[in-house]
Amino acid sequence: MTEEILKVEHLDKYYGNWQALHDINFNLKKGEVLTLLGPSGSGKSTLLRTLNGLEDYQKGSIYFHDKKIDPTIKEWQLLRQKIGMVFQSYDLFPNLTVMENILLAPVKVQKRQEDEVRKQAEELLERVGMQDYENSYPRELSGGQKQRVAIVRAMAMNPKILLLDEITASLDPEMVRGVQEIIEHLSNRDHMTMIVVTHQINFAENIADEVLFLEDGRILEDTPGKDFFKNPQTARAREFLDSMDF
């Protein structure tokens, strides 16, 4: 039986009096790619940020390896070392080189040896075709190159789960496929456990083991990927897919 790595039960999230997430329930198995789909404003990114402690929640439980997470700042600081996140906006430090961006958290936060992390970073940069840019600054890179560095930076922390929030949304169309291929390799070669938010339906179809379809902060479908794209169970999901060009 495949190990369950993350479980969410009855999660509610509010901004003031407005409820952004309603009774969210799902589990994630080791090596699985879970894709969050739905229209803009459906709660996908809010859910992703909640799973990394960047947003708090008012009700429900999150379990990591069967351990219930205490929703405190200290607990999330420790957990973020195991749950990596890559953002749409890259979030690289502009005053640091590519290599310095990658080394910072593993060395300063995880207290690992710099030589060990540097070797790992060099191998990861080569895998994403960025081996010649380790001394470059973010301002010298294209959007696609910055996103590759952001992925490497997250992977250098040796995360158990990788969260990807619309990582191709800010890229030129010609850059999108290259970044998508990196994620596909992480899934197929490394069996990396991932939760992916995307509007790229072809990409989602290629990588999704499971799909959560959300609208208005609610999960309308929790369906295996191979079934969702061929035969969605709800009229709203069928309408959503019909509106997408894929």
Place the predicted regions along the sequence by residue:
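C-terminal boundary and immediately downstream tail of ABC-type ATPase nucleotide-binding domains
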Residues: 226-246
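ABC family nucleotide-binding domain
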Residues: 3-225
